[in-house]
Regions:
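C-terminal regulatory/effector modules of DNA-binding transcriptional regulators
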Residues: 154, 161, 171-274
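Short glycine/serine/threonine/alanine-rich loop segments
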Residues: 16, 27, 193
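Short acidic (Asp/Glu) and glycine-rich catalytic loops that position anionic groups and cofactors
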Residues: 26, 44-48, 225-229
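Interdomain hinge/linker segments and adjacent boundary elements that couple functional modules
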Residues: 1-9, 13, 18-23, 37, ...
């Protein structure tokens, strides 16, 4: 999806239609659309030909995008969880793993990257009633596997704003919440993590429309992607005006939230009350 979005931006920037792009590599406009949506594999030669058509001559830029094409054709670790991973979320997991900066605002639950196993199990069991124990175990395992990027050599930076409501919404009982609060405190002390709490005391704010995540790919010099999850699907926004608006909203949320130390103090206070 990362490569497809970049190919679409390059095509649109030079005013070439999908029909014309498809003609140049002997495929239909529908096939070009599928490529740009990240819903098909990429032939390296096709990507090279499209880059030439789009006027991309810089060797470093071409190499980066061709490397992305090769990577996109490799089965990611998350394919092992295809039985519990819908296609619309598999795209997010792929992007999350490639991001160098993940910024998020959460209003209902702790973000999946920050959840303990017990908290994840409680959230999944509550939100997806009727699942078998095996399916719940698989979904928890997937969530824990995603978190391995936080331990990797190239761990992304995390900028997190949690609405205080997240911390008061009990999931799994007292012991589970104690473990989750302690985990957030420990995460907040990492050098690559900036965690802030939007307190109840602050009224209307820029995040009233709901949770969202902004993924940045500084290593690849690619545009940011905004992820907005829905009940049975998700929005992936990468157009400049959309990304800019969400970026401004997150900046306002950060300015209006408690600072990192005050947020840690609030987490400690809530932990002591459990």
């Amino acid at each position: 999806m990362l490569l497809g979005a970049q190919l679409r931006r390059l095509r649109e920037a030079c005013g070439i239609t999908r029909d014309a792009a498809g003609f140049s590599i002997r495929v239909s406009a529908v096939s070009i659309n599928r490529m740009e949506m990240g819903r098909t594999s990429f032939k390296t030669r096709d990507v090279e030909d499209l880059l030439t058509l789009y006027g991309i001559t810089d060797e470093a830029e071409r190499d980066t995008l061709v490397d992305l094409a090769r990577d996109a054709n490799l089965a990611g670790w998350w394919h092992r969880y295809s039985d519990v991973l819908p296609n619309w979320f598999a795209s997010y997991v792929s992007l999350e793993g490639a991001a160098s900066l993940v910024r998020m605002y959460e209003v209902h639950y702790v973000h999946g990257l920050l959840q303990t196993g017990a908290y994840a199990r409680a959230v999944i069991s509550r939100g997806m009633k009727g699942l078998s124990t095996t399916d719940i175990d698989r979904r928890v395992a997937l969530r824990m596997e995603r978190q391995k990027i936080l331990q990797s050599e190239n761990a992304p930076s995390l900028h997190i704003v949690l609405d205080e409501a997240v911390l008061h919404r009990s999931c799994g009982g007292r012991d589970v919440m104690r473990g989750q609060l302690q985990h957030l405190i420990e995460l907040s002390e990492r050098p690559n993590v900036l965690l802030q709490i939007m307190p109840f005391s602050f009224g209307g704010h820029a995040g009233e429309s709901g949770a969202f995540t902004i993924l940045s790919f500084l290593e690849y010099d690619l545009a940011d992607v905004v992820y907005v999850e829905q009940l049975t699907s998700a929005l992936y926004l990468d157009r400049h005006e959309d990304v800019a608006q969400y970026g401004r909203a997150l900046k306002e949320l950060q300015q209006e939230s408690l600072g990192p130390e005050a947020s840690r103090d609030l987490l400690r206070d809530l932990l002591h009350l459990q």
